[in-house]
């Protein structure tokens, strides 16, 4: 396994949209690297493939206290959403910056697990927020795009200072 470099704004590769994975067997090593990279961070609870420069549609999430229960989702899609929730978010691609973001309170996501089995997750807790955040990355969006232009500029300035 290898720790991959995490892209930070304003890297244009973060705007690329992920493509559906057709051969899950071929990306098993990459999935391991993505998990290892997430665990290598101090506080990362999720990571999308596009954050490390890949266009394979894969996200990994681990909300466990022990950080040893990764959830791997290949080709995830939000198929239902409802309600509204406002909460503070941060991002490994925007180090040192946090802001309040409005998200859906409840989501239903369909995906494949790392063995290629179809799964469905319906949640209205913190996982719902993390799923939306990571799936946004697969669509070429970072969370600050949900903010005003001024707040986006502040985030960019903080990242440049942090680098």
Curated annotation (Swiss-Prot):
Disulfide bonds: none annotated. GO terms for molecular function: metal ion binding; peptide deformylase activity. Its EC number is 3.5.1.88. Keywords: Hydrolase, Iron, Metal-binding, Protein biosynthesis. HAMAP family: Pep_deformylase. Removes the formyl group from the N-terminal Met of newly synthesized proteins. Requires at least a dipeptide for an efficient rate of reaction. N-terminal L-methionine is a prerequisite for activity but the enzyme has broad specificity at other positions. InterPro entries: Peptide_deformylase (IPR023635), Peptide_deformylase_sf (IPR036821). One of its GO terms (biological process) is translation. The keyword Iron applies. Its cofactor is Fe(2+). It catalyses: N-terminal N-formyl-L-methionyl-[peptide] + H2O = N-terminal L-methionyl-[peptide] + formate. PANTHER family: PEPTIDE DEFORMYLASE (PTHR10458:SF22). The active site is at residue 134. This is Peptide deformylase 3. Binds 1 Fe(2+) ion. Gene3D superfamilies: Peptide deformylase. Belongs to the polypeptide deformylase family. Fe cation binds at residues 91, 133, 137.
């Amino acid at each position: 396994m290898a720790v991959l470099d995490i892209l930070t704004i304003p890297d244009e590769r973060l705007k690329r949209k992920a493509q559906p994975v057709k051969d899950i067997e071929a990306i098993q090593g990459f999935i391991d690297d993505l998990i290892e990279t997430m665990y290598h961070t101090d506080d990362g609870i999720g990571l999308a493939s596009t954050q490390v420069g890949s266009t394979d549609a894969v996200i990994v999430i681990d909300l466990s206290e022990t950080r040893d229960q990764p959830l791997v989702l290949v080709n995830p899609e939000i198929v239902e959403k409802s309600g509204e929730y406002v909460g503070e978010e941060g991002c490994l691609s925007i180090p040192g910056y946090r802001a309040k973001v409005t998200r859906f309170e409840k989501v239903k996501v369909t995906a494949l697990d790392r063995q290629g089995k179809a799964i469905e997750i319906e949640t209205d807790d913190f996982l719902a927020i993390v799923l939306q955040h990571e799936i946004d990355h697969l669509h070429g969006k970072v969370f600050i795009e949900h903010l005003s232009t001024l707040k986006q500029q502040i985030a960019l300035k903080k990242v440049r200072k942090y680098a």
